[in-house]
Swiss-Prot record:
Substrate binds at residue 116. Gene3D superfamilies: 1.20.1050.10, Glutaredoxin. The keyword Lipid metabolism applies. It catalyses: RX + glutathione = an S-substituted glutathione + a halide anion + H(+); 11(S)-hydroxy-14(S),15(S)-epoxy-(5Z,8Z,12E)-eicosatrienoate + glutathione = (11S,15S)-dihydroxy-14(R)-S-glutathionyl-(5Z,8Z,12E)-eicosatrienoate. GO terms for biological process: glutathione metabolic process; hepoxilin biosynthetic process. Disulfide bonds: none annotated. InterPro entries: Glutathione-S-Trfase_C-like, Glutathione-S-Trfase_C_sf, Glutathione_S-Trfase_N, GST_C, GST_mu, GST_superfamily, Thioredoxin-like_sf. It holds the Pfam family GST_N. Homodimer. The modification Phosphoserine is found at residues 27, 44. The record marks 210 as: Important for substrate specificity. This is Glutathione S-transferase Mu 2.
Length: 218
Protein backbone atom coordinates (compact mmCIF):
# COMPACT_ATOMS: atom_id res chain seq x y z
CA UNK A 1 0.00 0.00 0.00
CA UNK A 2 1.52 3.36 -1.01
CA UNK A 3 2.42 6.00 1.54
CA UNK A 4 0.44 9.24 1.55
CA UNK A 5 2.21 12.60 1.66
CA UNK A 6 -0.08 15.48 2.55
CA UNK A 7 0.86 19.12 1.91
CA UNK A 8 -0.19 22.33 0.24
CA UNK A 9 -0.01 22.41 -3.55
CA UNK A 10 3.35 24.22 -3.39
CA UNK A 11 7.07 23.46 -3.09
CA UNK A 12 7.50 24.64 0.51
CA UNK A 13 8.59 22.13 3.14
CA UNK A 14 7.66 19.13 0.99
CA UNK A 15 10.28 19.63 -1.72
CA UNK A 16 13.08 17.67 -0.06
CA UNK A 17 10.58 14.98 1.03
CA UNK A 18 9.28 14.51 -2.52
CA UNK A 19 12.85 14.36 -3.82
CA UNK A 20 13.79 11.71 -1.23
CA UNK A 21 10.67 9.63 -1.97
CA UNK A 22 11.52 9.71 -5.67
CA UNK A 23 15.22 8.95 -5.14
CA UNK A 24 14.39 5.91 -3.00
CA UNK A 25 11.78 4.65 -5.47
CA UNK A 26 9.17 4.73 -2.71
CA UNK A 27 5.56 3.95 -3.52
CA UNK A 28 3.58 7.05 -2.53
CA UNK A 29 0.67 9.22 -3.48
CA UNK A 30 0.12 12.87 -2.72
CA UNK A 31 -2.78 14.63 -1.08
CA UNK A 32 -2.37 18.23 -2.22
CA UNK A 33 -4.42 20.87 -0.46
CA UNK A 34 -5.27 24.15 -2.19
CA UNK A 35 -5.40 27.48 -0.39
CA UNK A 36 -7.94 30.10 -1.42
CA UNK A 37 -7.09 33.51 -2.85
CA UNK A 38 -6.72 36.84 -1.04
CA UNK A 39 -8.04 38.33 1.11
CA UNK A 40 -9.33 35.29 3.01
CA UNK A 41 -6.79 32.63 1.93
CA UNK A 42 -9.38 29.95 2.66
CA UNK A 43 -7.72 26.88 4.19
CA UNK A 44 -10.85 24.80 4.70
CA UNK A 45 -9.62 21.97 2.43
CA UNK A 46 -6.98 21.22 5.05
CA UNK A 47 -8.82 22.39 8.18
CA UNK A 48 -11.78 20.11 7.44
CA UNK A 49 -9.44 17.10 7.64
CA UNK A 50 -6.82 18.34 10.09
CA UNK A 51 -8.11 16.55 13.19
CA UNK A 52 -9.57 13.51 11.43
CA UNK A 53 -6.34 11.84 10.30
CA UNK A 54 -5.12 10.50 13.64
CA UNK A 55 -2.02 12.71 13.71
CA UNK A 56 -0.49 13.35 17.14
CA UNK A 57 0.43 16.91 16.18
CA UNK A 58 -1.80 17.74 13.19
CA UNK A 59 0.15 19.80 10.68
CA UNK A 60 1.40 19.93 7.10
CA UNK A 61 3.34 18.17 5.75
CA UNK A 62 2.32 14.75 7.04
CA UNK A 63 3.26 11.23 5.93
CA UNK A 64 1.02 8.23 6.52
CA UNK A 65 2.63 4.82 6.03
CA UNK A 66 0.26 2.14 7.27
CA UNK A 67 -0.01 2.60 11.03
CA UNK A 68 2.84 5.15 11.07
CA UNK A 69 1.55 8.71 10.99
CA UNK A 70 4.26 11.35 11.00
CA UNK A 71 4.37 15.15 11.01
CA UNK A 72 7.33 17.56 11.04
CA UNK A 73 9.28 17.65 7.78
CA UNK A 74 12.61 16.49 9.22
CA UNK A 75 10.97 13.62 11.13
CA UNK A 76 9.43 12.52 7.83
CA UNK A 77 12.80 12.75 6.06
CA UNK A 78 14.53 10.76 8.80
CA UNK A 79 11.83 8.08 8.70
CA UNK A 80 12.27 7.57 4.94
CA UNK A 81 16.06 7.77 5.27
CA UNK A 82 16.21 5.06 7.96
CA UNK A 83 14.31 2.71 5.67
CA UNK A 84 16.94 3.13 2.96
CA UNK A 85 20.17 3.49 4.96
CA UNK A 86 20.52 7.17 4.05
CA UNK A 87 21.62 8.44 7.47
CA UNK A 88 25.05 9.07 8.95
CA UNK A 89 26.68 5.95 10.40
CA UNK A 90 29.76 6.97 12.39
CA UNK A 91 29.58 9.34 15.35
CA UNK A 92 31.40 12.00 13.30
CA UNK A 93 28.85 11.65 10.49
CA UNK A 94 25.93 11.82 12.91
CA UNK A 95 27.30 15.00 14.48
CA UNK A 96 27.74 16.63 11.05
CA UNK A 97 24.26 15.45 10.10
CA UNK A 98 22.64 16.95 13.21
CA UNK A 99 24.49 20.26 12.88
CA UNK A 100 23.70 20.62 9.19
CA UNK A 101 20.05 19.61 9.52
CA UNK A 102 19.41 22.30 12.13
CA UNK A 103 21.54 24.96 10.44
CA UNK A 104 19.69 24.44 7.17
CA UNK A 105 16.33 24.79 8.91
CA UNK A 106 17.47 28.08 10.48
CA UNK A 107 18.45 29.45 7.09
CA UNK A 108 15.32 28.09 5.42
CA UNK A 109 13.18 29.92 7.99
CA UNK A 110 15.24 33.09 7.58
CA UNK A 111 14.34 33.25 3.88
CA UNK A 112 10.72 32.30 4.55
CA UNK A 113 10.28 35.03 7.17
CA UNK A 114 11.64 37.57 4.71
CA UNK A 115 9.40 36.43 1.88
CA UNK A 116 6.25 36.59 4.01
CA UNK A 117 7.11 39.98 5.54
CA UNK A 118 5.03 42.94 4.30
CA UNK A 119 8.28 44.97 4.43
CA UNK A 120 9.95 42.52 2.02
CA UNK A 121 11.42 45.18 -0.29
CA UNK A 122 12.87 47.10 2.64
CA UNK A 123 14.38 44.00 4.27
CA UNK A 124 15.63 42.23 1.12
CA UNK A 125 18.96 44.16 0.84
CA UNK A 126 19.98 43.13 4.36
CA UNK A 127 19.31 39.46 3.56
CA UNK A 128 21.30 39.67 0.33
CA UNK A 129 24.16 41.35 2.18
CA UNK A 130 24.42 38.42 4.59
CA UNK A 131 23.92 35.71 1.97
CA UNK A 132 27.59 35.35 0.84
CA UNK A 133 28.77 34.77 4.42
CA UNK A 134 26.06 32.16 4.97
CA UNK A 135 26.93 30.34 1.74
CA UNK A 136 30.64 30.52 2.50
CA UNK A 137 30.05 28.46 5.66
CA UNK A 138 28.20 25.79 3.65
CA UNK A 139 30.99 25.81 1.07
CA UNK A 140 33.61 25.27 3.78
CA UNK A 141 31.52 22.55 5.43
CA UNK A 142 31.18 20.66 2.14
CA UNK A 143 34.83 21.11 1.19
CA UNK A 144 35.97 18.74 -1.55
CA UNK A 145 33.52 15.98 -0.64
CA UNK A 146 30.81 15.00 -3.13
CA UNK A 147 28.15 15.00 -0.38
CA UNK A 148 27.90 16.83 2.92
CA UNK A 149 28.74 13.79 5.07
CA UNK A 150 31.35 12.39 2.69
CA UNK A 151 31.18 9.88 -0.15
CA UNK A 152 27.65 8.66 0.62
CA UNK A 153 24.53 10.68 -0.06
CA UNK A 154 22.27 11.09 2.99
CA UNK A 155 18.96 12.77 3.74
CA UNK A 156 20.63 16.06 4.74
CA UNK A 157 21.85 16.46 1.16
CA UNK A 158 18.21 16.65 0.11
CA UNK A 159 17.56 19.48 2.57
CA UNK A 160 20.80 21.18 1.52
CA UNK A 161 19.85 20.98 -2.14
CA UNK A 162 16.46 22.52 -1.42
CA UNK A 163 17.84 25.40 0.67
CA UNK A 164 20.75 26.18 -1.66
CA UNK A 165 18.68 25.96 -4.83
CA UNK A 166 15.85 28.14 -3.51
CA UNK A 167 18.42 30.79 -2.60
CA UNK A 168 19.70 30.48 -6.16
CA UNK A 169 16.15 31.07 -7.41
CA UNK A 170 15.93 34.08 -5.08
CA UNK A 171 19.32 35.49 -6.17
CA UNK A 172 20.55 33.68 -9.33
CA UNK A 173 24.21 34.71 -8.97
CA UNK A 174 24.55 33.82 -5.27
CA UNK A 175 26.48 30.57 -5.84
CA UNK A 176 28.87 31.93 -8.47
CA UNK A 177 31.62 32.48 -5.89
CA UNK A 178 31.27 28.92 -4.57
CA UNK A 179 32.12 26.38 -7.30
CA UNK A 180 31.80 23.39 -4.95
CA UNK A 181 28.21 24.36 -4.10
CA UNK A 182 27.37 24.78 -7.79
CA UNK A 183 28.92 21.36 -8.45
CA UNK A 184 26.86 19.92 -5.58
CA UNK A 185 23.66 21.25 -7.17
CA UNK A 186 24.63 19.79 -10.57
CA UNK A 187 25.63 16.46 -9.02
CA UNK A 188 22.32 16.20 -7.20
CA UNK A 189 20.23 17.12 -10.24
CA UNK A 190 22.24 14.63 -12.28
CA UNK A 191 21.18 11.65 -10.15
CA UNK A 192 19.20 9.36 -12.43
CA UNK A 193 15.96 9.23 -10.44
CA UNK A 194 16.11 12.92 -9.53
CA UNK A 195 16.67 13.90 -13.15
CA UNK A 196 13.74 11.75 -14.27
CA UNK A 197 11.49 13.23 -11.58
CA UNK A 198 12.43 16.78 -12.56
CA UNK A 199 11.35 16.05 -16.13
CA UNK A 200 8.03 14.54 -15.03
CA UNK A 201 4.64 16.20 -14.60
CA UNK A 202 4.81 15.38 -10.86
CA UNK A 203 7.67 17.81 -10.28
CA UNK A 204 6.57 20.96 -8.43
CA UNK A 205 9.41 23.53 -8.15
CA UNK A 206 7.01 26.51 -7.94
CA UNK A 207 5.35 28.19 -6.18
CA UNK A 208 7.97 28.17 -3.45
CA UNK A 209 5.59 29.56 -0.82
CA UNK A 210 1.84 29.96 -0.28
CA UNK A 211 -0.29 32.75 -1.72
CA UNK A 212 0.23 34.78 1.47
CA UNK A 213 3.92 35.33 0.65
CA UNK A 214 5.17 38.56 -0.93
CA UNK A 215 7.82 36.71 -2.97
CA UNK A 216 7.63 33.14 -4.28
CA UNK A 217 3.83 32.92 -4.34
CA UNK A 218 3.58 32.00 -8.05
Amino acid sequence: MPMTLGYWNIRGLAHSIRLLLEYTGSSYEEKKYTMGDAPDYDRSQWLNEKFKLGLDFPNLPYLIDGTHKITQSNAILRYIARKHNLCGETEKEKIREDILENQLMDNRMQLARLCYDPDFEKLKPEYLEGLPEMLKLYSQFLGKQPWFLGDKITFVDFIAYDVLERNQVFEPSCLDAFPNLKDFISRFEGLEKISAYMKSSRFLPRPVFTKMAVWGNK
